[in-house]
Amino acid sequence: MNTKFPITAKGFEKLEHELKHLKHVERKKISEDIAEAREHGDLSENAEYEAAREKQAFIEGRIKELEDMTARAEIIDIGKLSGDNIKFGATVTLIDDDTEEEVTYIIVGEYEADITRKRVSIASPIAKALIGKSVGDFVEVTTPKGSKSYEVVTVEYKELEL
């Protein structure tokens, strides 16, 4: 898959950090674990060896995945973005029309979404509904839990913390 995808500079740093850790720390550790397990004799009935080999396969798969992701990433520096319209990287404050509760979301890349930190994927229903809107606009969001209506209160572009 060669499709570029948007990611924040901080999100990209996180991917790179994980990739370096897997390559330079975990690879070495798993090689040592495999060598130690080999010393225990017959490999056909060696659970430690099998577990270490499975972990090695997982780590190598994740390394390949991260290498692919970092190669395809389109890094977007949110700190340099501005404007009144909502786009990737926006921190958006909304008011729920039903409850009058205020909620804030940050629109980020697919691989850095984390709802516990109010970071929603650009591919999510809420982000798709918000893209292109501005302060004062009303938006209807359809999710698996049903439909909700919000008013856009603020749109900001500011650097993310890791």
Swiss-Prot record:
Signal peptide: none annotated. It comes from the Bacteria. SUPFAM superfamilies: FKBP-like (SSF54534), GreA transcript cleavage protein, N-terminal domain (SSF46557). It holds the Pfam family GreA_GreB. PROSITE patterns: GREAB_1, GREAB_2. Keywords: Coiled coil, DNA-binding, Transcription, Transcription regulation. InterPro entries: GreA/GreB_C_sf, TF_GreA/GreB_CS, Tscrpt_elong_fac_GreA, Tscrpt_elong_fac_GreA/B, Tscrpt_elong_fac_GreA/B_C, Tscrpt_elong_fac_GreA/B_fam, Tscrpt_elong_fac_GreA/B_N, Tscrpt_elong_fac_GreA/B_N_sf. The keyword Transmembrane does not apply. The keyword GTP-binding does not apply. Residues 45-74 form a coiled coil. One of its GO terms (molecular function) is RNA polymerase binding. GO terms for biological process: DNA-templated transcription elongation; regulation of DNA-templated transcription elongation. Necessary for efficient RNA polymerase transcription elongation past template-encoded arresting sites. The arresting sites in DNA have the property of trapping a certain fraction of elongating RNA polymerases that pass through, resulting in locked ternary complexes. Cleavage of the nascent transcript by cleavage factors such as GreA or GreB allows the resumption of elongation from the new 3'terminus. GreA releases sequences of 2 to 3 nucleotides. PANTHER family: TRANSCRIPTION ELONGATION FACTOR GREA. Belongs to the GreA/GreB family. HAMAP family: GreA_GreB. This is Transcription elongation factor GreA. It comes from Rickettsia felis (strain ATCC VR-1525 / URRWXCal2).
